[in-house]
């Protein structure tokens, strides 16, 4: 049963992951994000009551 011999497919698996891990991260990390995240205030805002016309 050839699928039990790990020599051919294990080497292909390892080399393909090495290629993915050396090529993809620099491409992804090379992007420049145009929107800088802003910190939101931690104080809780008080909700404004609505003036509903109850008919």
UniProtKB/Swiss-Prot annotation:
Cell compartment(s), UniProt: Mitochondrion membrane
Region (Disordered), start-end ranges: 36-55
Coiled coil (residue ranges): none
Main location: mitochondrion
Keywords: ATP synthesis, CF(0), Hydrogen ion transport, Ion transport, Membrane, Mitochondrion, Transmembrane, Transmembrane helix, Transport
Pfam families tied to this protein: ATP-synt_8
Membrane topology value: Single-pass membrane protein
Record's GO cellular component terms: mitochondrial membrane; proton-transporting ATP synthase complex
Biological processes annotated in GO: proton motive force-driven ATP synthesis
Molecular function GO terms recorded: proton transmembrane transporter activity
Transmembrane segments: 4-24
Family: Belongs to the ATPase protein 8 family.
Subunit structure: Component of the ATP synthase complex composed at least of ATP5F1A/subunit alpha, ATP5F1B/subunit beta, ATP5MC1/subunit c (homooctomer), MT-ATP6/subunit a, MT-ATP8/subunit 8, ATP5ME/subunit e, ATP5MF/subunit f, ATP5MG/subunit g, ATP5MK/subunit k, ATP5MJ/subunit j, ATP5F1C/subunit gamma, ATP5F1D/subunit delta, ATP5F1E/subunit epsilon, ATP5PF/subunit F6, ATP5PB/subunit b, ATP5PD/subunit d, ATP5PO/subunit OSCP.
Function of the molecule: Subunit 8, of the mitochondrial membrane ATP synthase complex (F(1)F(0) ATP synthase or Complex V) that produces ATP from ADP in the presence of a proton gradient across the membrane which is generated by electron transport complexes of the respiratory chain. ATP synthase complex consist of a soluble F(1) head domain - the catalytic core - and a membrane F(1) domain - the membrane proton channel. These two domains are linked by a central stalk rotating inside the F(1) region and a stationary peripheral stalk.
Protein name per its UniProtKB record: ATP synthase F(0) complex subunit 8
Organism: Salvelinus alpinus (Arctic char)
């Amino acid at each position: 049963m050839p699928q039990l011999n790990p020599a051919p497919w294990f080497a292909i698996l390892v080399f393909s992951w090495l290629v993915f891990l050396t090529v993809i991260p620099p491409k992804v990390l090379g992007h420049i994000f145009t929107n800088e995240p802003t910190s939101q205030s931690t104080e809780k805002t008080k909700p404004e009551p609505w003036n509903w016309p109850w008919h």
